[in-house]
């Protein structure tokens, strides 16, 4: 598929979004690039929330131990790699929660459409914790629009959302005309269209954002 430079620029501007982080009850970081989790943990360390929930996909599990999780003194780090071994590879997905009491993890139910799967699991997690009334959602700036679409369709309208973009993964030396970035934007644009159709069967509760 061929996209002109002008069209790619328009797609990028249309997709990109991000809000200033603010104090909340929990931070949720979607699976994907490592910088998302580093940024989320930075916000957690700066006191933006008393807890953080990290979504860890199958391709992140092996290197997850490299993240600077806030383990209490004397606590043995969790071993996601061992926990994942008996699980079929396509179903290896975990939520890792960190708060003042320590670090724990749970398996994310299998399902299609990764981002929607994560937000539905987040809805279940929040439903078990009624004290969570506000969230900062962390992902890449081009992914957040699709994330917001899922949140509006799945999460309770009472939850107050802030969508924070993680730092850029890097800028192209040729001004952003590189083929990988073009393909990434084009694919995200197509995914957004697919999700719009899929989410028509969900009730959209008009969540608050901003």
Name each model feature, range by range.
Residues 2-179:
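A structural signal for short, hydrophobic/glycine-enriched beta-strand patches
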Residues 65-67, 206-210:
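Amphipathic, soluble alpha/beta structural segments
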Residues 177-208:
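A transmembrane-helix-recognition feature enriched in membrane-embedded lipid enzymes
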């Amino acid at each position: 598929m061929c996209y002109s430079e002008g069209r790619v620029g328009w797609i990028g501007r249309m997709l990109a979004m991000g809000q200033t982080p603010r104090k909340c009850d929990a931070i949720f970081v979607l699976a994907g690039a490592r910088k998302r989790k580093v940024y989320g943990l930075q916000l957690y360390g700066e006191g933006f929330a008393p807890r953080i929930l990290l979504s860890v996909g199958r391709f992140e599990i092996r290197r997850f131990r490299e993240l600077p999780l806030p383990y209490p003194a004397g606590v043995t780090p969790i071993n996601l790699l061992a926990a994942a071994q008996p699980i079929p590879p396509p179903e290896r997905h975990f939520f890792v929660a960190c708060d003042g009491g320590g670090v724990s993890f749970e398996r994310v139910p299998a399902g299609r459409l990764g981002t929607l799967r994560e937000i539905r699991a987040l809805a279940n997690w929040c439903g078990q914790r009624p004290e969570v009334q506000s969230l900062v959602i962390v992902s890449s700036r081009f992914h957040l629009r699709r994330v917001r679409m899922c949140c509006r369709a799945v999460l309770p309208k009472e939850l107050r959302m802030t969508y924070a973009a993680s730092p850029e993964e890097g800028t192209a030396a040729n001004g952003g005309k590189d083929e990988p970035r073009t393909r990434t934007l084009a694919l995200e644009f197509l995914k957004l269209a697919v999700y719009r159709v899929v989410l028509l069967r969900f009730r959209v509760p008009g969540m608050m954002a901003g």
